[in-house]
Amino acid sequence: MFKIEKIFFWKNAHTFHQCTVHIVFVPKYRRRVLQGKVATRIRELFFECCELNSWFIHEMEVMPDHVHLLLQFPPDVSIAKAAMFLKGGSSRKLRQEFPELEEFLWGDSFWQDGYFVETVGRMNQSVMRNYIKNQKIERTMTSHGL
């Protein structure tokens, strides 16, 4: 892995790459359940999944009703596969560890179907990092009418 101006380029046998996406996951019914211990645990689960798969989280912000990730992975991993691993593994674990969530999230899944994703080139990666970092600040200002 090479680091150039806070941008990571990975080298495999036949590729030199930097595949980064901004991805947003939302709990089912957009319930505000990503708070306290659940928010802490979701961060841990996402970092564990990425470490296990040799992916890299540049930035993450857990809001009460959604999660922003700036995620980098190799080109042989599809966005759909990365989303499936992150959402599937965390959903199962969260439902096991926090059975009280069943009151808010009926059915067998924690996450809403689908996700938002956009690719992030190296020219606008720092802009996206700041956007994700400042989610809580912007949300607080908006909710207070500022």
Model-derived features with residue positions:
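Basic nucleic-acid-binding interfaces
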Residues: M1-L146
